[in-house]
Structures are given as structure tokens and as C-alpha cells.
Amino acid sequence: MAAQAAAAAQAAAAQAAQAEAADSWYLALLGFAEHFRTSSPPKIRLCVHCLQAVFPFKPPQRIEARTHLQLGSVLYHHTKNSEQARSHLEKAWLISQQIPQFEDVKFEAASLLSELYCQENSVDAAKPLLRKAIQISQQTPYWHCRLLFQLAQLHTLEKDLVSACDLLGVGAEYARVVGSEYTRALFLLSKGMLLLMERKLQEVHPLLTLCGQIVENWQGNPIQKESLRVFFLVLQVTHYLDAGQVKSVKPCLKQLQQCIQTISTLHDDEILPSNPADLFHWLPKEHMCVLVYLVTVMHSMQAGYLEKAQKYTDKALMQLEKLKMLDCSPILSSFQVILLEHIIMCRLVTGHKATALQEISQVCQLCQQSPRLFSNHAAQLHTLLGLYCVSVNCMDNAEAQFTTALRLTNHQELWAFIVTNLASVYIREGNRHQEVLYSLLERINPDHSFPVSSHCLRAAAFYVRGLFSFFQGRYNEAKRFLRETLKMSNAEDLNRLTACSLVLLGHIFYVLGNHRESNNMVVPAMQLASKIPDMSVQLWSSALLRDLNKACGNAMDAHEAAQMHQNFSQQLLQDHIEACSLPEHNLITWTDGPPPVQFQAQNGPNTSLASLL
């Protein structure tokens, strides 16, 4: 018996020593791999060699699966060898499913593998993989929620918003059952965002009301609570801005700005909630700051506070540049493109066409780096080029750009914006496009079935109808449309539309010989245009003031207005020549495919300047 016991003890000791040796070689290889991965610069080839050296030891299944996951992750994140990355991740997923209590490896492998499939445009392989992982992860709240978010995002990228909303609804109910009101709010707010994108406003309102109650009642980590509030307020603000309600949005926007100030003062401790389902964060604090700058720029642009828009754009772009040095998140490029889109429109209004053109070129370069970004912003890019073409009086190119943009968009508000601008191009062109123009005006008829709910776009449609009636010589009809624009733009502080309507009304009264009423319109138009500042309206107003004062015998005032008009003309003319001389001016001929990679310099401008003088 004693001999048997001694032999057993000896065998156990040998087994323990063997296990210890196995542990030591594994830990040594793992340590080396991690050392090489975190070196500066990372030595990825050596890291991969160390991890591959694990397999000849015939390790247990757990170590084998985890090593395949580590190799797949390193190859996916640090190399272009997607084939090997896929092979390792597929093995990790396959082996880990056979091992009980191995959730972290199993679901991380599924999550990474589906990401890789999407990157390779194998979405049909990613969907069933995620569905299976979701099905078997119900006892693991963190992973179940994360995988639901991931599949919802995949459907969103495919523009299948109905399926994405369904999944987010499932996630919200699951989060409620497992007692995570925080993650329930994240699911519901994400669903609200998609419903806003789909324009399902009847569903959005009760959902946002419920979200507001959940956010206010939730007692948890202050940063998480404030980030939920930022998400909620961003949705409210963008909802108002989409509806063109620039004045009504002000209280929400002010709350949002106060909220982001509160977040920036909170200490950024690592959040370790007791409920694993709460281990999510909507956006990093720095990204939220940029987002709040962005919606502030959107508001300033719509309201016609263009200097304020410029100030916040500069702040946001500076912060984005810092963030992009450390973080290659695609959302940062999206923020940058949206900011540039808004500031380009500001530049065109304030008479800085050359700068606007260079920024359009910058958007092209960002879109060249990301096919998805280009797909999402191609219509906006052609719209901006159309607006630039109008500003330099290249009307045929403007028509081509707007027509291209219409072909590329399904977004109703953008469609209405493009059609409104295209109609104004046709109006300025005279009788060349009468049939098409009548068709367009009927499709954006603000008196009948206007296609979108935007207050701002509807007011703009009234203005375009007024402009058309003015060119047709139907002055009473023009006055009716323009007064409607004024009523709507005053109600929501739409300063640019107010200025444009006032100066056009002033022009009508001048043509009708009612000089006093004309003056009553043109003087406030000039004041408002100076405040925006809108160079085209200032040019137009100063010309009218010159003619008005001349007609009324006010020689000194007429001379002063003429001098102002001359100054504005010179500024616009200089900027016009500079813009048309840039190699980027060739972008106006691009109407198909991805953005051109480079531009050939021209000998000089080839556009008419008559409209400016």
C-alpha cells in the first residue's frame, strides 16, 4: 500500500510539474507576444511568431481557442492579411462553441469575425453568425446586448432600418428584463435615431417622451447619466433642425450646451457598474464635444448667424485634428465632412468662394479614403458643387451638378433643397427650361402638397415661387408669396430668407414706382444682410439703395450707396477670379463616379462675371 501511495504521489508530482512547465512555456510565449505587440513601434511579425509557437505544444482546447482568437485579432487589427485573420477567427469560434463556460472567447470571436466578414463585403456570412451568437448568448447580458447592437448596426449600414429598429426593440426589452435601465435607454435612443432617419415622427414622439423619463429617473454613474442626456438632447435638437424650426430649438440647444459643459467638468473615472449589461458607453466625452459643436454649427447656419457658425466650426475642426492623431474611428471623418459641408455653404454666402472650393476639394479627399463615406455624402458633395457653380455664374454646370445630386439621393429634405435651388437656376436662365421648371415648381408647391415637413424649406419654396412670379412680371402674386416667406421666416428667425424676401419685395416696389415702400424693405434687408453677413444680398441692396436715392433726388445718399456697391462688387469680383483660377475649379465638370484624384491647373477663369457687376 505504501509503495502504491508513493508511486501515486510521484505520478501526481510529475503531472503537476508537467502542468507547471506547460503553464510556464505558455505564459512565456504569451508574455513575449504581448511585449512585441505593445513595443513602439509594434513588432507584429514577432508577436505573431510567438503566438504561432503555441500550437506545436498541442495545448488544451481552451488555450488553442484563445490563441486562435489572439492571432486573428492581431492579424485583423495590425496587418492586411485578412485571409489568415479569418482562418484563425473561424477556428476560435468553432472550437470555443464546444467548451462550456467560455463566453468571452466565444463571443469576441463571433463579433470580430462578423466585423471582418463585413469588411470583405461578405455581409451574408456575418448575419447568420451574429444571429447564432445572439441566440446562444442570452445568459451573458453584456455580450447579448453588444451583439444585438452590432447586428442592428449592420442592418443600418445596409439601410434596412426596419430590421435594425426591430433588433433595438428586442434589446430594449431584454435590458429591461435584466434590470439595466441605462442600456434600455441606449437601445431606445438608438431606435429613436433610426425612426427620425425614416421620418416616422408619430412613433418618435412617444419614444422620446419615454426616453426622457428613463434618463431623468436613472440613478447611476454621473458621466453615464449625462451622456444619456446628451444623446437624448442631440436627437431633440436634430429633430427640430430637420423640421426647420430654428427658433423653437433654442431651449433644447441651450440645455445640450450646458450638459456638455457639465460632462467636461466630471472626473473621468473608469466606469465599473455592478450590472454587466451596463458596460456600454454611447460616445467618448471628446466625441460628444465635437458633436455638440456640430449641431450648434447646423443651428447657426440655418438661422443665418454665419460668423458664429465659423467660430464653432474652427473649434470643432481643431478638436477633430487632435483626436484623429490618436483615434482612427470612422465617426470622426463623418463629423469632419458634415462640418465642412456646413461651413462651405457659409463661405459661399459670405463671399469666400475660393476657400469654399478648397474645402469642397478637402471633402473629396476624405471621401476618396472611404467608399462608405462617399456613398453617404455623394449627393451632398454634388449639391455643394452646384451651389458653387451658381455663385460663379456657371449655370449649365450648376444644372448638371444638381441633376446628379437628385439622382444620388433618397433623402426627402435634401431632395427638396436641391429642387428649390435647381428651380432658381432655371428661373435665372429665362425661357430655356420652361416645361421642366413648371414641373419642378409643381412638385415643391408650398400651397398644396409640399413633400417635406421642414418649415425652413417650405418658406424657401414660397420665396422661389415669388422669384418666379417676379421674373414673369406678376408682381401682386410675387408679393403674396414673399409675404408668406416673411411670415414663416420671422416666426422661426430664418434671417437669410428674411433678408432675401425683403430685398426682392423692395425691388418689386421700386419697379412699381412705390419708392417709399421700397425703401422700407431695402434698408432692413441691408442691415440684416450686414449682420449675417450675406454678400450677394448686400450687393443687391446697395444697388437698389443707389437707384432709389437717385430717383428720390438724394444725391449724397445715392453716392454713398454707389460707393458701397462698388466695394462689394470689387470684393466679389476678386474672389470670383481667384476661385475660377484654382485647379480645383475643374471639379465643376465632375458628374459621375468617385471624386477625381487630382486637378489640372487652368490658364485662368472661363466664366462670365456679368452677373456680379
Swiss-Prot record:
Ranges for region Sufficient for interaction with NIPBL: 1-115
UniProt name for this protein: MAU2 chromatid cohesion factor homolog
Organism taxonomic ancestry: Eukaryota, Metazoa, Chordata, Craniata, Vertebrata
Listed GO MF terms: cohesin loader activity
InterPro entries hit by this protein: MAU2 (IPR019440), TPR-like_helical_dom_sf (IPR011990), TPR_rpt (IPR019734)
Main location: nucleus
GO biological process assignments: cell division; chromosome segregation; maintenance of mitotic sister chromatid cohesion; mitotic sister chromatid cohesion
Gene: MAU2
Keyword annotations: Cell cycle, Cell division, Chromosome, Chromosome partition, Mitosis, Nucleus, Repeat, TPR repeat
Family, as annotated: Belongs to the SCC4/mau-2 family.
Function per UniProt: Plays an important role in the loading of the cohesin complex on to DNA. Forms a heterodimeric complex (also known as cohesin loading complex) with NIPBL/SCC2 which mediates the loading of the cohesin complex onto chromatin. Plays a role in sister chromatid cohesion and normal progression through prometaphase.
Compartments, as annotated in UniProt: Nucleus, Nucleoplasm; Nucleus; Chromosome
TPR repeat windows: 107-140, 379-412, 459-492, 499-532
Subunit composition and interactions: Heterodimerizes with MAU2/SCC2 to form the cohesin loading complex. The NIPBL-MAU2 heterodimer interacts with the SMC1A-SMC3 heterodimer and with the cohesin complex composed of SMC1A, SMC3, RAD21 and STAG1.
Metal-binding recorded as keyword: no
GO cellular component term, pick one: nucleus
Organism (species): Homo sapiens
